[in-house]
Amino acid sequence: MPNRVDIAAFQKVMIVYNRNSGKQLFASMLARVNEVKKRLKQVIDPKSLEIVEIKSFEQVEGLAARICQEKYDWIIVAGGDGTLRAIIDVFAKHEHMPYVSVFPAGTVNLVAKELLMSNDPAKCVKRVSKGIVSPVQLGKANGHIFLTVAGIGFDSLVVDNVS
């Protein structure tokens, strides 16, 4: 995998946002997602950009499979760790996997924090527009992909109750 990619050459780019991600107000998240979209249109061909809202994890499987089948180049996931994990879980089952960026819009956003991704639209687009690639090693437990840590018992109870 190269250390940098030329995002201007990407023909198919999608922003996927989960309107139910995190415990924040949807209007606030949507405003930030729209700002990312506006700024991205300044660095890539606007015709190559699609924005898709998901409302549940049930919608993720079909959308992520479509992304792979239609060979999207780059996906920006605006959501939390759960949204990102659900999408990557489907991607890992397909031959084609697009480049993935995360725009933190969930409760904790541990993956975004580990990758030093900002939730400020200007900073996010500035960073991703440089095309810097940060490979992430996927883990797998009980047939499911995980990106940072896997927890059971009390640990998972604590994560479910994070505010």
Where do the PLM segments sit?
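Short glycine-rich loop/turn motifs that provide flexible caps or phosphate-binding loops at active sites
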Residues: 21, 78-81, 105, 150-152
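ATP/NTP phosphate-donor binding region
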Residues: 1-78, 85, 89-90
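Short amphipathic alpha-helical surface micro-motifs
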Residues: 31-35, 83-84, 120-122, 129-131
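Catalytic core of DAGKc-family lipid kinases
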Residues: 14, 43, 54, 93-163
